[in-house]
């Protein structure tokens, strides 16, 4: 189930984003970005709708997924 980011409290959204970044160890290219820079980049993607926050009832977990991957 997709969770609309606009319905989340700011602190909750920030915690989800930070948890995702720390869990994924996402590669941001040749230059290393700070946690804050990574958070801002991911928040921007969420607000633009290119990625979405997803709740899995089966696994009882929350994740951030590329919207195009969900449409496949």
UniProtKB/Swiss-Prot annotation:
A Pfam family reported for this protein in Swiss-Prot or TrEMBL = UPF0270
Matching entries from NCBIfam families are given as:
PRK04966.1
Lineage of this protein's species? Bacteria, Pseudomonadati, Pseudomonadota, Gammaproteobacteria, Pasteurellales
Listed HAMAP family? UPF0270
What protein family does this chain belong to? Belongs to the UPF0270 family.
What is this protein's name?
UPF0270 protein PM1156
Q: Which InterPro entries match?
A: UPF0270, YehU-like_sf
The superkingdom of the source organism is Bacteria
The region annotated as signal peptide is none
């Amino acid at each position: 189930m997709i969770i609309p980011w606009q319905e989340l409290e700011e602190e909750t959204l920030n915690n989800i984003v930070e948890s995702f970044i720390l869990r994924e160890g996402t590669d941001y290219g040749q230059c290393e970005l700070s946690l804050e820079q990574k958070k801002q980049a991911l928040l921007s993607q969420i607000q633009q709708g290119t990625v979405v926050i997803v709740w899995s009832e089966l696994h009882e977990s929350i994740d951030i997924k590329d919207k195009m991957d969900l449409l496949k």
